[in-house]
Amino acid sequence: QAVRSGRLDNKQVTRVVEESKKLKELPLYIDDSSLLSPMELRARARRMNRQLPNGLSLIVVDYLQLMQVPGSLENRVNQISEISRSLKSLARELNIPILALSQLSRAVEQRNNKEPMMSDLRDSGAIEQDADVILFIYRDEVYNKEDPNNKNIAKIIIGKQRNGPIGDVTLTFLKEYAKFVDYIPEDKVPEEGFYSKFDS
């Protein structure tokens, strides 16, 4: 919030500059091309995998429904199925994980229990079939702001894990940093502006 408003003290400005330098040195590459097709993603990933000394370690797609299948006149469900299968194939080819964010259907907003479930994945059951792990983030305080017990609490719902158990994990969400950390009792959550304890 302070960064967006420009209300930073000298110490915070110094910190932002230092962290910006660290980010610049990270092997992080962002391609913000719109309406990327599975074939285009595969071609770019292969090229970068060859160019980098140690190859790619992870691909993040934000988000899956923004990808397109050119020339396809089929319905959106079939398109998403093709995109999902393509990402699965690319992950196997490059032997790296692909993290694909996905939209949820509007059904979540129309029921009393807002916790997302597998059937809420938008457009296709192929996502559920192809993914090795499916995680949902749920913050009850978004819907029940008056309940003090929900403050700063986030739940990671493990909807699917091909080689492990499913269930819930409770975390603390530090809003001012948009950061999830191990669960901290409410009376131990740091005041806004405190950051050193939670440095990565």
Residue locations for each model-derived region?
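C-terminal regions of RecA-like/P-loop NTPase motor modules
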Residues: 11, 35, 39, 43-56, ...
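Conserved H-loop
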Residues: 101-103
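Conserved inter-motif catalytic segment of the P-loop NTP-binding fold
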Residues: 1-75, 82, 109-110
